[in-house]
Amino acid sequence: MEIENSSDLIIDGLYSFLSAGVDEVGRGALFGPVVAAAVILPEDVLDDLASTGVTDSKKLTEKRRCHLASLIRTVAWDCQIGIASVREIDRLNILKASLLAMKRAVLRLKLRPDLVLVDGNQEIRDLFIPQRTVVKGDSKCLAIAAASIVAKVWRDTLIMRLAKKYPVYDLTKNKGYGTKKHKQGIINYGVSPQHRLSFSPCQPSLFEVRS
């Protein structure tokens, strides 16, 4: 399915209003926060971004994501990050924490959008800005795809820094997701303070928490 150039939407062909795309990454990881990005793109860059291959971040190589994230930040009118911590994930559950990260990203925008395009089928609670959910939005909407790329690169950069502190979990390769080597590291060394204790592979009843 082709990406839609929907950073600016048109009502009745007369009124163009400002919209932000928002997406999160890291929902399925065992380690680290969930990270969201909110992006507002000017209409005159949409075709160029689409032609450069902006799409769902999961479909891109790491090198390509880094290049596109830098480009998106350069051309965007506004681009902000929101996170929900590991402890918030454990306290709220991963869905609520993901929506909280998205809300924080939107509220950090210096420009107030008239509409927020939210990836998925869940609206952001208590946002007080009109919003529209877009299922598989990172494959359908350019602004959401851009947000997914920015969020993914930001989170991966964070995990790479944390990997130096916690080398036993193979984080440089798995970026916090539950690979065989990551799970074996948990079995051998216990969990770190950055592991999500509400996720079954990280249950505190089974493993010692390492500082």
UniProtKB/Swiss-Prot annotation:
The keyword Phosphoprotein does not apply. Keywords: Cytoplasm, Endonuclease, Hydrolase, Manganese, Metal-binding, Nuclease. Gene3D superfamilies: Ribonuclease H-like superfamily/Ribonuclease H (3.30.420.10). It is found in: Cytoplasm. GO terms for cellular component: cytoplasm; ribonuclease H2 complex. It holds the Pfam family RNase_HII. It catalyses: Endonucleolytic cleavage to 5'-phosphomonoester. Its main location: cytoplasm. Its cofactor is Mn(2+); Mg(2+). Manganese or magnesium. Binds 1 divalent metal ion per monomer in the absence of substrate. May bind a second metal ion after substrate binding. It comes from the Bacteria. The keyword Kinase does not apply. GO terms for biological process: DNA replication, removal of RNA primer; mismatch repair. One of its GO terms (molecular function) is RNA binding. Its EC number is 3.1.26.4. Residues 17-211 form the RNase H type-2 domain. A divalent metal cation binds at D23, E24, D119. Endonuclease that specifically degrades the RNA of RNA-DNA hybrids. PANTHER family: RIBONUCLEASE H2 SUBUNIT A, RIBONUCLEASE HII. Belongs to the RNase HII family. This is Ribonuclease HII. The lineage of its organism: Bacteria, Bacillati, Cyanobacteriota, Cyanophyceae, Oscillatoriophycideae. The gene is rnhB.
